Amino acid sequence: MNEQTVLAPWPEHERTTSSVLFNNVPCAVLVPFIKNAGGLDLLFEVRSKTLRWQPGDISFPGGKIEASDVTPLAAAIRETGEELNIPPEKIRVLASLAPLETVTGVTLNPFVAEVSSVEDIRCTAEVDHTFTVPLQWFMEHEPELAEMDLATRPGATFPVDIPYAGNPMEWRRRKTYFVYIYRYEG
């Protein structure tokens, strides 16, 4: 496998330019690789279970682009430092990928980078732990394709007794999108 294979553009059907339902939130993530004797490993983090937003989720380091961030890349590097204590000099940026507009209103700016080693990682309160998966494993395994529904549901204070509200149980999903699921046991 060569670097071109790793950095190949996403197929067109995986990109979305659909209109979003919420205010746009610009975010940036780092897709970190670690080079080792066996090839390249992809580094993931597991978010702390104490977080209010997506606790326990598996993710890449990243987050909202702050006003102090000069560029989306600066945000991705800052977030990686905040979450994993990896200093900027231990991050070698390889490429930027096309921004991805999500149905939830996040514009994601991804950057592929090599980080020096797992020994440099010191998880902060935002991250429970990290793990790596050999890139070769992804090349050898097909993901499951699962549907997610984005729907509008009334909150606890929504007045369902007024005539125009109708039966909230009859409200339908507004958008279906697909997610790829890999089940790695390593």
What are these regions (language model features)?
Residues 1-59, 64-119, 127, 136, ...:
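N-terminal leader/linker segments that precede catalytic domains of diphosphate-processing enzymes
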Residues 124-131:
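Phosphate/pyrophosphate-binding betaalpha-module
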Residues 132, 138:
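Sequence-specific DNA-binding recognition helix
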Residues 139-149:
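Short acidic, Gly/Pro-enriched loop/turn segments at secondary-structure junctions
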